[in-house]
């Protein structure tokens, strides 16, 4: 009887205090996909705003602001490789928008917390 009561009590305690384990690290594939998503968003915003007739400086500040706003609260931000992000943005701008003279140093303003 005592044994059954002890088994029931321990089983109950294990079920109550069982906490799921979540990984702190994210896979490289997830981080790479997130970086590509950011670069596509920035590139599309910049392309659309320049095609709409906004100046290059205005398009740049608008694109940086919109991208920062959209991605500022993501947990993956601390894992972003900014060099890879900048290269992806430049490649997207060259391939999709035919913009070859984009000032790379301006991408330093694209930073997430």
Segments and roles (model prediction):
Residues 1-23:
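Classical Sec-dependent N-terminal signal peptides that target proteins to the secretory pathway
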Residues 24-75, 95:
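Short N-proximal segments of mature Sec-exported proteins
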Residues 57-113:
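Compact alpha-helical subdomains of small soluble proteins
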Residues 8, 31-32, 78, 82:
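Sparse, context-dependent recognition of short Cys/His-centered cofactor- or disulfide-binding micro-motifs
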Residues 4, 11-14, 28, 51, ...:
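Low-complexity, intrinsically disordered short peptide segments enriched in small/polar/basic residues
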Residues 4-7, 16, 36, 86-88, ...:
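Alpha-helical interaction segments
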